């Protein structure tokens, strides 16, 4: 049963998302999210998503010093981002993670760690307001064969890229998910390793990849008897 506190958080979050200052941002970031999950990632948008989200979750930063809590604009890649837009980034990105099945990752870090921050509000809201979040992506889902929430995160066997400011947006995505997957907010710094690499795959890409592997194995199995016959 939803507590009064959770109802209050839900109401506050909905009100924030409906603020006039957020309307333009909401439209902008809906489009941005569509580009984020389409076959061709928009790298500038990916970069901004990940920088802001990493700032929210990094234990090396204090909550009151985070980008989305400062009352001024920041410039990233010559794009001006207001505080309202920054908060919208966080909400959509956290929603995106939830729809990919990462809510457990967020809960693992403990909601109490986000006390007084927009991400705390949104995380609590996601637990009790999943349907609203799905509605947020309704226009995206209606134009895509595979719904957003059917995205998979798949490990890939290659070296985790170096993490420095200005690196590729893909690097930031890997860094963010690696951090969420392995560390608590109050935890010790994590050094990325080869086994920590992740890549986003859509459901259809995952299926194609899976069947391609099966076909490859079947082909290899057919080759082996023929080779042994030739040797005889």
UniProtKB/Swiss-Prot annotation:
- Organism, by scientific name, is European mountain ash ringspot-associated virus (isolate Sorbus aucuparia)
Listed name of the protein = Uncharacterized 27 kDa protein
Pfam family membership, one: ABC_AB
Check the record and name the InterPro entries matching this protein.
Answer: ABC_AB
Domain of life, source organism: Viruses
